[in-house]
Regions:
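Extreme N-terminal starter segment of soluble prokaryotic enzymes
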Residues: 1-3
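Short beta-strand/turn micro-motifs composed of small residues
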Residues: 6, 45-47, 143
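Active-site metal-binding loops of divalent metal-dependent hydrolases
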Residues: 6-8, 27
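Conserved N-terminal subdomain of the carbohydrate kinase-like
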Residues: 10-22, 37-117, 131-136
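Short secondary-structure boundary/capping elements
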Residues: 23-27, 98-102, 121-122, 147-150
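Histidine-anchored nucleotide/phosphate-binding helix
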Residues: 26-36, 130-131
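Short, acidic/turn-prone active-site loops that include or flank metal/cofactor-
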Residues: 26-29, 70-72, 143-147
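Conserved beta-alpha-beta core of the PfkB/ribokinase-like small-molecule kinase fold
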Residues: 115-169
Length: 169
């Protein structure tokens, strides 16, 4: 089994020609949807009560959502803009909301996962969560500038708990 932990979000994305508000986003969301073409991944994430049911239905079609928590409060939100080439991104706003105090746990049926992907998320949560798995054959984490600039020491420690690292600017 593949388990993916990280953010499920509502994103506002600005391009030179369009603004998309509160669209389905989050690193764990995108990783889970991509993986679902090959396996049925388990998702560990948190959303707020404001998370649209239509997005929940999209995820539930091909992803095991036993690890998706719905908490009082607002879903994590990200806002960013892209330049004319769509290759340069500027983060405009990051509101952690329910993600800020989330204490993730691994559902029993996920603990035997052979593969774990710690998608872009709080490195302290990632370090804690990876310890809950019984027999991981391969683990990988992802991080971005937000965590590197706000929790650099934790990011470095997180790298030591996984087999591979992906860094995005």
């Amino acid at each position: 089994m593949l388990t993916i932990f990280g953010s499920t979000a509502l994103d506002t994305i600005r391009t030179p020609t369009r603004v998309l508000k509160d669209v389905l986003g989050g690193a764990a969301t995108f990783a889970s949807i991509s993986a679902s073409f090959f396996v049925k991944p388990g998702l560990i994430a948190v959303v707020g009560k404001d998370f649209p049911k239509k997005y929940h239905k999209i995820l539930a079609k091909r992803i095991d959502l036993n690890g998706l928590s719905i908490k009082d409060g607002k879903t994590f939100r990200y806002s960013g803009s892209y330049d004319n080439t769509l290759s340069l991104r500027t983060t405009l706003r990051t509101d952690l909301n329910v993600l800020k105090d989330f204490k993730p746990t691994v559902p029993e049926n996920y603990k035997k996962s052979s593969f774990v992907y710690l998608a872009n998320n709080d490195p302290d949560q990632n370090k804690s969560l990876i310890k809950e798995f019984d027999n991981v054959k391969f683990s990988m984490c992802d991080t971005i500038d937000f965590w590197i600039s706000t929790k650099r020491a934790s990011v470095i420690k997180m790298f030591k708990t996984v087999d591979a690292v992906v860094i995005n600017d």
